[in-house]
Amino acid sequence: MRIGLYGGSFNPVHLGHVGIAKRAIADLALDKLVVIPAAVSPFKTAPDAEARRFWTWDRVEMVKAAFRDLEKTVVDLREVERGGVSYAIDTVRQIAAENPGAELFFVIGEDSVEGLPRWKDIEELKKLCTFKSYPRTPESSTAIRKLFEDNSVVLNQDEKIVRVVRDGLVRRGGYCPCRLPKNPEFFCPCDEFKGQLADKEFHGLCHCRLYRKP
């Protein structure tokens, strides 16, 4: 069996992630692609406890919605459920043990290749799986977050809004909770809920109001 492993923060999940998944399934002739959201990335600043509690499971629901219709794909929550910093080696060891004889492929974005030497137990990891990188298109999660940060936009912690965003993703099968203003490929999964999301302070940076001006 050929199994692809696609880990990451997916914060936020977007069309680029789904595009990479589709390419990996085809290019590598995968029998299964396992999408693994991280609890906390070892290479990114961890959110404070309150933000982490608030955001983690909504992020998970969005990841599930984004990948739910992609054939041969499953979402694995072991890292989120384990909590703490997520190291790829811990997860790959487990999956290798659970699937003896399987050929494992670790799918990463092109921008992660340079940092591979810093991954925990990278030499063992390379023996357990084959790495395959893909360009980040049309955007990276980091670029999306930077756009909002540069415009002083923060995560909206209004639970009603987050719930509506999540419901929109599920009902519309959307891939991204936030469409970049200059990128029409990103559609808002919550267009149908605009009446519920009225916000006089909103400046048009985030179409679904998951982020807001402080």
Where are these regions (language model features)?
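Nucleotidyltransferase catalytic core that binds NTPs
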Residues: M1-D158
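Long, distal/terminal scaffolding or interaction modules
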Residues: L155-P214
